[in-house]
From Swiss-Prot:
Enzyme Commission number(s) of this protein: 2.2.1.2
Record-level Gene Ontology MF annotations: aldehyde-lyase activity; transaldolase activity
Catalytic activity: D-sedoheptulose 7-phosphate + D-glyceraldehyde 3-phosphate = D-erythrose 4-phosphate + beta-D-fructose 6-phosphate
Annotated organism of origin: Agathobacter rectalis (strain ATCC 33656 / DSM 3377 / JCM 17463 / KCTC 5835 / VPI 0990) (Eubacterium rectale)
Active-site feature positions: 85
Family annotation (PROSITE patterns): TRANSALDOLASE_1, TRANSALDOLASE_2
Keyword Nuclease: no
Pathways per UniProt: Carbohydrate degradation; pentose phosphate pathway; D-glyceraldehyde 3-phosphate and beta-D-fructose 6-phosphate from D-ribose 5-phosphate and D-xylulose 5-phosphate (non-oxidative stage): step 2/3
Its biological purpose: Transaldolase is important for the balance of metabolites in the pentose-phosphate pathway.
Record flagged with keyword Cytoplasm: yes
Compartment(s): Cytoplasm
Name of this protein: Probable transaldolase
UniProt-listed CDD domains: Transaldolase_FSA
UniProt keyword annotations, A-Z: Cytoplasm, Pentose shunt, Schiff base, Transferase
Length: 217
């Protein structure tokens, strides 16, 4: 399974990229707003760091297909690695159809049902982003959605890739891998958590203590 980092924070992106564990980045209007920087400025800097798919979303206030198509073309023109993130709506699907026909990669976001994922795939989406954590928040098993979409896409041979989103903890990542997600887009803090295990820490401390006992510092 491939990993993307889910953030617009350039420093976190650099740290994740330096580990060699990510091959893409996802952003959204909330993450961009959190940084308090110009969208194009942030995206251009991200493309200079990570050589892989970079998802940039149309403005949250753009709700019509015509507007999404216009903005999608502008986002795609920033860099060849750009992926246009489109919300799962009727107008969004119209935009995906047009953009995909022009060879522009799209990521349909805010997916909360298998039917939504199927519609997005039929419209030509490059990626679909089902949200685990937000489903878990309302007592619905988010991982079951990943499993359903993966099985359906396998049955019918869809090329659309599944990006598991709204990842809250390392257990989500493991579950997504087992459920068949192609990609997990993960906050940097969760990537850091994934590197840790108490037995690893104990093992390092033991090795260090044994070495010092014989050779000193």
């Amino acid at each position: 399974m491939k990993f993307f980092v889910d953030t617009a924070n350039v420093e976190d992106i650099k740290k994740a990229n330096d580990m060699g564990v990510i091959c893409g980045v996802t952003t959204n209007p909330s993450l961009i707003a959190k940084e308090g920087r110009d969208f194009n400025e942030v995206i251009k800097e991200i493309t200079s760091i990570v050589d892989g798919p970079i998802s940039g979303e149309v403005k949250a206030t753009t709700v019509d297909a015509e507007g999404m198509i216009k903005e999608g073309r502008e986002i795609a023109a920033i860099h060849p690695n750009m992926v246009v993130k489109i919300p799962m709506t009727v107008e969004g699907l119209k935009a995906v159809k047009v953009l995909s026909s022009e060879g522009i990669k799209t990521n349909v976001t805010l997916i909360f049902s298998a039917n939504q994922a199927i519609l997005a795939a039929n419209a030509g989406a490059t990626y679909v982003s089902p949200f685990l954590g937000r489903l878990d928040d309302i007592s619905q098993p988010g991982i079951e959605l990943i499993r359903q979409i993966s099985e359906i896409f396998d049955i019918y041979g869809y090329d659309t890739e599944i990006i598991a989103a709204s990842i809250r903890n390392p257990i989500h990542v493991t579950d997504c891998a087992l459920a068949g997600a192609d990609i997990a887009t993960i906050p940097y803090k969760v990537i850091e958590q994934m590197t840790k295990h108490p037995l690893t820490d104990q093992g390092i401390e033991k090795f260090q203590a044994d070495y010092r006992a014989v050779f000193g510092d």
